[in-house]
Design a protein with these regions (language model features):
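Conserved glycine-rich cofactor-binding loop
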Residues: 11-12
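Conserved glycine-rich Rossmann-like NAD(P)H-binding loop of the short-chain dehydrogenase/reductase
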Residues: 27-41
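The beta1-alpha1 cofactor-binding region of Rossmann-like NAD(H)/NADP(H)-dependent oxidoreductases
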Residues: 36, 57-68
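Conserved mid-core segment of classical short-chain dehydrogenase/reductases
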Residues: 90-105, 146
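Active-site helix of classical SDR
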Residues: 119, 153
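Residue(s) in the substrate-gating loop at a strand-loop-helix junction
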Residues: 137
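SDR active-site lid
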Residues: 166, 170-233
Length: 264
């Protein structure tokens, strides 16, 4: 019997890579994403490759839509073998430049609260041997100007994942958190396009191919001892530097590695 993978944010970027790779491994794939047009395109592309896939339009920050998505999956009498919590958003902007609290709330609700609510909602469909993968970020391991909300939510996901892992060990469900670096995805290209000018100073940010990073991440979702997955070499270096160097030196180096705004 085929296994089933449910992937939030699976219609494009890293999420679509996960869908495609797991489909090749004979998983039935269920995609949750906001945009019905993107979902249809993703499903058609997967089916062209012989992958069994379905899609559900769902904004994970909306509790009613999330409940409806759960009911739709449950009605198929399907157990979830791999739950991938990948949906997220980023707005590169100084905290002081936000003019509406609704925009702040949307990022918190999507990246952090929505991910937690999705995990809570679909936990009843997981069983012994199931896996959960949460997509955090290298920015979940440090703070960068222009990413106050993104860094806060991604850091929260790391601690959430660690706590959830310990809660589910007794049930034989493994939890992993990946912290990828910059990847060449539609979301990253839009992020760069909308970044304020001060963030575009210095050398262009180095990106990794999403398909390569996705395969690396999935290949490491094995065993109960593994938890934090760092597919990018620059993120691994950040972790090593943070452990080895005194905090003062670490901050000195990071302050000079990343752009900083000019005082107004």
């Amino acid at each position: 019997m085929k296994k089933t993978a449910l992937i939030t944010g699976g219609s494009s970027g890293l999420g679509f890579v996960f869908a495609e790779e797991l489909g090749k491994q004979e998983y039935n794939v269920i995609i949750l994403a906001r945009d019905p047009v993107k979902i249809d395109h993703a499903i058609a592309s997967l089916k062209e490759k012989g992958i069994t896939a379905t899609g559900i339009s769902c904004d994970i920050s909306n509790e009613n839509q999330l409940k409806n998505a759960f009911d739709a999956v449950k009605s198929q009498e399907t157990k979830i073998d791999f739950l991938i919590l990948n949906a997220g958003m980023v707005i590169p902007q100084l905290l002081s430049d936000y003019t509406e609290t609704s925009v702040i709330r949307k990022q918190l609700d999507t990246n952090l609260c929505g991910t937690i609510m999705t995990a809570w909602q679909f936990l009843p469909l997981l069983q012994k041997g199931s896996k959960i993968l949460i997509t955090s970020s290298g920015f979940g391991l440090m703070g960068a100007a222009g990413y106050t909300l993104y860094c806060a939510t991604k850091a929260g996901l790391i601690n959430f994942g660690e706590a959830l892992r310990r809660e589910l060990l007794c049930k034989g469900i493994n939890v992993y958190v990946s912290c990828p670096g910059d990847m060449d995805t539609p979301q990253f290209r839009e992020e760069i396009r909308t970044s304020p000018d001060w963030m575009k100073t210095g050398s262009p940010r180095k990106t990794q191919a999403a398909d390569q990073e996705g395969r690396k991440i999935l290949s490491q979702c094995k065993g109960k001892m593994k938890f934090l997955i760092l597919p990018a070499s620059d993120v691994k270096l950040l972790v090593i530097v943070s452990k080895v160097l005194p905090r003062k030196i670490r901050d000195y180096l990071l302050d000079r590695m990343f752009p900083q705004p000019i005082a107004k």
